[in-house]
Amino acid sequence: MTSSNKYEDNLEKNSANYTELTPLSFLERTARVFPDHTAVIHGSIRRNWLETYKRCIKLASSLSNLGIGKGDTVAMMLPNVPAALEAHFGVPMCGAVLNALNIRLDAKTIAFILDHGESKVLLTDKEFSNTVKEALNLCKSKPIVIDVQDSLAPEGELLGETEYESFLESGDEDFGWQYPKDEWDAISLNYTSGTTGNPKGVVYHHRGAALNSIGNITTWGMQHQPRYLWTLPMFHCNGWCFPWTITAMGGTHVCLRKTEPGPIFQAILEHNITHMCGAPIVMGMLVNASSKEKKS
């Protein structure tokens, strides 16, 4: 094709000079370059990047087997556990959009979001079974419910058709996941909390998520392979994009179910934490923690 601009002649986009911006590329690269580096720490769980990558692929495959694909919404009602991190990759790897629900909301609000976002699948932790059960009774949509059984979770009712680990096992680690065809395709759907009226939906696209993730690195002057403590909820603006940021840096995600001083101080010492996030109230809680909590 000939153009009036000489710099555009025979320079159309192709696989050699262009790829869509997406945080999914971060996981693929990190698993290839640092397969044996620790990716996730949670209780007694230790997984490297290759293992984590394969689990994300199997999640994408399992969702695809349910008929989930581009434009479908997959919701999660999860604390900061490994499954929440995996959902940030596995859900968009099958073309779907992740809706991370605020675990502090009431059943009526959760029901509204499930309906408004048209969720086809819901990943949920048994700690929130009372709220989720009521929400499912209130909402018009009937998502497929998958229980995430975390060994550190308190008691609760299992509500789903299947359990998360069994669901993953139904997937294929050789599943041919693909980048988005357009970097403006949606990767996640978030909702406002604490506003007047009903929650308002906010869409992230792959391009924006990738750029913000990289922006986190430059803003913090982050060094290679950080050790990040999950004190910030992943449901809060997708954890400010740090699920993707830490992955891009080949770092280690140290999961934390509850943001409490004792476990935070313990994790900082035990896992040599280099970075963490938190609202001022979280930092104030740490500053004002008891001597016993600080020594935990």
Language model regions located:
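Conserved AMP-binding A3 loop
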Residues: 48-51, 178, 187-211
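Conserved AMP-binding/adenylation subdomain of ANL enzymes
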Residues: 210-227, 235-275, 288-291
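Conserved AMP-binding/adenylate-forming core of the ANL superfamily
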Residues: 19, 24, 28, 36-81, ...
